[in-house]
Amino acid sequence: MASPPAHRSSKAADEELPKASSTFHPSLWGSFFLTYQPPTAPQRANMKERAEVLRERVRKVLKGSTTDQLPETVNLILTLQRLGLGYYYENEIDKLLHQIYSNSDYNVKDLNLVSQRFYLLRKNGYDVPSDVFLSFKTEEGGFACAAADTRSLLSLYNAAYLWKHGEEVLDEAISSTRLRLQDLLGRLLPESPFAKEVSSSLRTPLFRRVGILEARNYIPIYETEATRNEAVLELAKLNFNLQQLDFCEELKHCSAWWNEMIAKSKLTFVRDRIVEEYFWMNGACYDPPYSLSRIILTKITGLITIIDDMFDTHGTTEDCMKFAEAFGRWDESAIHLLPEYMKDFYILMLETFQSFEDALGPEKSYRVLYLKQAMERLVELYTKEIKWRDEDYVATMSEHLQVSAESIGANALTCSAYAGMGDMSITKETFEWALSFPQFIRTFGSFVRLSNDVVSTKREQTKDHSPSTVHCYMKEHGITMDDACEKIKELIEDSWKDMLEQSLALKGLPKVVPQLVFDFSRTTDNMYRDRDALTSSEALKEMIQLLFVEPIPE
């Protein structure tokens, strides 16, 4: 290895804070969510009462559905899930899914039905074969679908993205239908609901969309459909607006916590992104019962952001090593190990973890021990990356991912979400499984790492950073940065296939475990698809406005 380059001296670390970097723009939201309430707040009690009535009305519709009317039943389940209502009907939907899976007596020549059935079952954990699409292939390599049957074309395109390795028929379906949908889009009225659906799918296939954002965007489209169910539509609007009220209360709480953290710790150099971090984590745990998960996740993400900025940008190597030594002690007595500017943050971090235990109560406070273990491992890996940086060491891609797929925080995030869940199916065994960093979680971690690196490498190459996976791939294969980024995008695509295959093979775990990992993947894809939206958060402003500021008109 090369000898370590000269780094910033920590001589004055106890006397002054690290200087703020001009890289990070200030918060776009300031104190907005400390005081904001959506205009629907005064009607909350009436909204809840009406929503309860509608939920039971829709439940009757769902209970009246049978596989004898398969197209209608499949479409109803898909609609409820897209509108963000699936959570309320898990038992009814699970029963119907089993019947749909077991019933092979359906019209296998109906491309729309075949596509929707395949999509629905694979999305919900059924390993159905893809050869159901072979009969639709033409001699020219395309798929038989009448030019006017645009709905079937779109359904096939979205279904094909639930693909596994080696499923050539789905590879071909994607390439064939994408071209036809792109051509179709040019002939549709841009503002028509179907044009919006096609455009959304070409940008992000249905399976990869963030659930709560999809609900917000799909409700106005569903409202225009001739076959809409009025009770379902009204419930979807009320449900979203009620969730928005909860989200704003949680944002107020998290914003107040963050402001106190920064004011007392005086760490003004870190990225001020608590609203964006809540938005990101909300995308993984948006269902109504997961309020505590959203709060824990947001605070953990805030803590990780501070630690990451200390290690990656502002702290000296010596200071970061001192922090790592103190971190695992989880005790105020360890502050003597720290430079002055880290001491207040360390105390506030301990108080935050204690607040998690208090919120969980005696029966579930044990979960915080697992969360602490995940965070200890994260900081340990940060120190390894600092050593690589100081030694100018560029690992191979495989060696890098052995560390960085975990140091991206995959375990800390999954354990944070599981910790806050009221679901008693989350047990000690669930946490022990997650902390063992099984292949499914490792693949998710690699996905997050690669997604982050491919959009942040060019920005970070001008600073004193550890080499990214992009740099590792460039050196290992002797190619340009642009070529390496294209290859990494292929690896990201492969990660979706890997995660699907691995999730279908999982046994003995609560259903929420793989669901959560996919929801994390979706919200991460939304954050990093075209840009690093956490660091440069202007791209998120409109989405945040839609989710947390603007109610859906009734």
Swiss-Prot record:
Q: Where does Mg(2+) 1 bind?
A: D308, D312
What SUPFAM superfamilies would the database entry show? Terpenoid cyclases/Protein prenyltransferases (SSF48239), Terpenoid synthases (SSF48576)
What's the main place this protein lives?
cytoplasm
The record's section on CDD domains has: Terpene_cyclase_plant_C1
Q: Which cofactor does it need?
A: Mg(2+); Mn(2+)
Q: In which pathway does it act?
A: Secondary metabolite biosynthesis; terpenoid biosynthesis
Motif (DDXXD motif) on chain: 308-312
Any matching Pfam family: Terpene_synth
Q: Does the keyword Transferase apply?
A: no
Sites where the protein binds substrate: D308, D312, R449, N452
Q: Name one GO cellular component term.
A: cytoplasm
Free-text remark on how the cofactor is bound: Binds 3 Mg(2+) or Mn(2+) ions per subunit.
Oligomeric state and interaction partners are given as: Monomer.
This protein is called what?
A: Inactive sesquithujene synthase B
